UniProtKB/Swiss-Prot annotation:
This is Uncharacterized protein ZK1098.3. GO terms for biological process: nucleobase-containing compound metabolic process. GO terms for molecular function: 3'-5' exonuclease activity; nucleic acid binding. Keywords: Exonuclease, Hydrolase, Nuclease. GO terms for cellular component: cytoplasm; nucleus. It comes from the Eukaryota. InterPro entries: 3'-5'_exonuclease_dom, Exonuclease_MUT-7-like, Mut-7_DEDDy_dom, RNaseH-like_sf, RNaseH_sf. Pfam families: DNA_pol_A_exo1. The keyword Ribosomal protein does not apply. Residues 422-619 form the 3'-5' exonuclease domain. The lineage of its organism: Eukaryota, Metazoa, Ecdysozoa, Nematoda, Chromadorea. The keyword Hydrolase applies.
Amino acid sequence: MGDTTSSEDVPENKQKSLKFEIIDARMKIFKDIVKSKSSESVKEEQIYQKSLEFFDEDLKSSEESVSNEEIKTGSEKELEPLNVFDIILIMLQQLPERKKPIGSLLSKWILMNFMNWMQDKQSIMEQQMTEYYQKKAGLACVKEPKNEEYLLQIFKISKEFVIDLRKSKVQEYLENQKFKEAAEIVMKHEVVDDYSFEQITLPLILCDKVQIVDELLKISKKLQKSYISFLDQFVAETDETVNAFFEPYKEKGMVTINLSRFHGKSLTIFMQKFFNGQVKQFKFDLEERRDAPKFVANMKRKALKYFVGKRFEDHEMNDELFCEHMKSTLPECTDKTIVQFLILLWDTCIYERRIEALFWATYSNIDRNSKYMPPDLKEELENPTTEMKNGLEKLQALRTTKNCQEEDEQLYVFEEQKKYPIRIVQNEQDLEILLSELGELEEGMYIGYDSEFKPYHLIDVSTSRLAIIQLFFKDKAWLINCVAIDNLASRDDVWIRLYKGLFESNKFSIVGFDIRQDIEAMFTVPSINKNFKIENIQNVICVKSLAENVNALSMDILNLSTKTSKLSVLADHLVGLKMDKSEQCGNWQCRPLRRNQIIYAVMDAVAVFEVFQKIVEVVRKHELDAEKLLVESHMITVKKEKVRRDCKNISLIPWNEFYQIIHTHRNPEKPLQKPSELKIVVDTMVLGLGKNLRLLGFDVYIPRDVTELKEFLRKMDKMEESEQRLVISVPSRSYEMLKSDNPNAKFVLIPNIYEKVPIDLVCSFFDFFNIDISPDQDYIKLNC
């Protein structure tokens, strides 16, 4: 017959079980004490008395264990005698609430009590202290350094001994690919910089331990730079190059993450979010230009391509705007990026664009012997044909003049009527005048507010986005030249005074259209971000929200056809103001500003002011509670109270209304994608989103069930690159299984789906992929 003795019957296990039963009972007593409502001093005294009681019990048990050693027989002789040092170490491991402040305090009390108790018990030290327990105490210090001060004294071990154990333990974890455990030790002991990015951080990235990576980055500037350099090396690289880097790690079984995030557009989006997210939030010591040169070059290359498309293909950008963008962007580019831009123009073989290539090659003074320069373009630069030479000279002559404001010239919002003079603020003296006029405003007045931003590809994460701020009040428009202010030696003081003058006044309110993004841009100014909090602003009203709140009561009040409208639509409909949008793609960082730019910019502040006044007038005419609507339209209210749309099927929304909503979910300063350019397969948890995307012209594969989805993904793994589809899923256990089974598939996760109605899900999708749709595209299947 086989041995039927259970593990619980083994004497060694019986001893261990009894030991832990005793300690468990003690922990319950300690927990009751720390959870009681007694004062801290009372708790400390109770812990002290109980600790001494327990230590005496352990001593008595250990002495009895030793004295009984001679009469033990058989397997009993193999048992270790009870040891007070063993018990105290086990108690530390089992303490209640040990990860909370009260747990730390409890461990401190118990260790101090043990030290006091041991003072007159030298014989116990000689009898029961062994190298085994000293090493065990050293490992306890490695695991929890906050107890180190007391354990070093109790167990008579040195700091160097603990350091050696720590290094050995970390190395053991690394060799066994327990990178999370290794990271926890180096963070607790504040020795993160003793280990390279490749030793701990990179393996954690590859096994998708994002939270631990974030904690490491918060601690170490060195790792921050290593991390962004790691990402930057893959920008604009081929799939083969990227895959080759990770192959050795895959062979070691270290890769569980979806590597698609390190390829192409997924990588640049990820890096953008990193710079705008963690870098800003935790104030990492990182700057795009300094620490991610390939990322910056790629952004500029994309921007140049975008401007060429807008100028020569879409015909939405005039020559003045195009030149401004080129003159701001090209000096910031490397020779390689400039030549790529020239080739983009030259290789079209279109005369007009080839002249442009010659013009910008001459303007940028590019080295004609650059290894990137194509031979035919180099030849044309050195020996231009008569036709090309004449075309170049004509273009150069055309671009020698610029329509700028003359010095001391008074500009008006409406030039013909000389209505609403424009005042420029660009130094401390100008600011004094503005603040003085703000101070003279009467109680309850309103100020129209708008701002324009610098091109995204020309700023760093630490750079203010603001290019200009426009104000309108008392029939006068103000344009604040933020670029000029940033160049003042006293810029910090100027910004703080301006902020206080605008946003800390109880006399007036500021009105803007979709104004939160303007205020968030204001908080990219370092001195403002450092000294103020956006949630403390109380005097800002969102006119877009006000119009939507009125429409929610009845569409007949403002007599609008859609619940959500652009400012230009509201201005035209409510006050008969037709807004010129020819400068919409302008470069607001370029100086000096042109006359048309200045007038265009301040027009938005005038428009939002007049639209606001008209809405309030109409609301009061209908005898509605205007004050309640204004409170509900405050910027902070908009942030906190998300408007829910209860439409379950977007096909029920009129197309013109749907377009007005979805069209705002894109960034025209970045490359746009058309629905037809994306191939998608949806997880079974987002089938509704898939159906709605199909209505909008996306190429969507919608599986009937999980089985069909898994089968499709298996087949897709063998398809050509051109036939691959993005897999749209949600963070879940099902996604983890799909990702594990299909490591080559590219997944995109849509978070918080259960908190969003269908149209919000579509908006999230458009935000992520920067989708552009036209109001008259014929593939749309929604109601018209």
